[in-house]
């Protein structure tokens, strides 16, 4: 009876250990701090897809101190970010330079949507930022190593 009880206690412990080992440290902590990304596309809630002409013009870097820096086409900005729960994300106001970007730029669209980001998920090494009320999803990939 005692050996059966020990076995029953060890099986869940081993299962928990194995499942935790399958999650990378970044996913386990839920932290975006120290990561940098470039925009792949935006998929709107209405299935509209917007693809940047140059991914390198649309980047975001999450600092470990809760600061975020962004390049949004011809402008650069800084602001704050926080994640108060698993996969939750919220940006504070973004202080941006005010250059006029060329026609066809995704600048205005991204700036309008910035405050509506509410959650994120990292899947297949891509970062997906979801807007509130199914407004759309931004898909980012890691910045290439320099």
Q: Could you say what each language-model-derived stretch is?
A:
Residues 14-15:
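Short, linear, compositionally biased motifs with a strong N-terminal bias
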Residues 5, 9, 18-146:
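Lipid interaction determinants
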């Amino acid at each position: 009876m005692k050996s059966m009880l020990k076995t029953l206690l060890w099986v869940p412990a081993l299962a928990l250990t194995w499942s935790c080992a399958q999650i990378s440290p970044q996913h386990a902590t839920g932290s975006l701090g120290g990561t940098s990304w470039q925009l792949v596309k935006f998929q709107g809630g209405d299935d509209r897809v917007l693809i940047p002409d140059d991914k390198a013009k649309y980047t975001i870097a999450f600092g470990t101190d809760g600061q975020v820096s962004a390049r949004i086409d011809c402008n650069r900005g800084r602001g704050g970010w926080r994640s108060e729960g698993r996969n939750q994300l919220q940006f504070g106001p973004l202080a941006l330079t005010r250059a006029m970007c060329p026609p066809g730029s995704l600048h205005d669209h991204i700036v309008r949507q910035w405050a509506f980001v509410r959650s994120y998920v990292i899947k297949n090494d891509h970062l997906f930022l979801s807007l509130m009320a199914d407004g759309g999803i931004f898909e980012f990939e890691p910045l290439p190593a320099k």
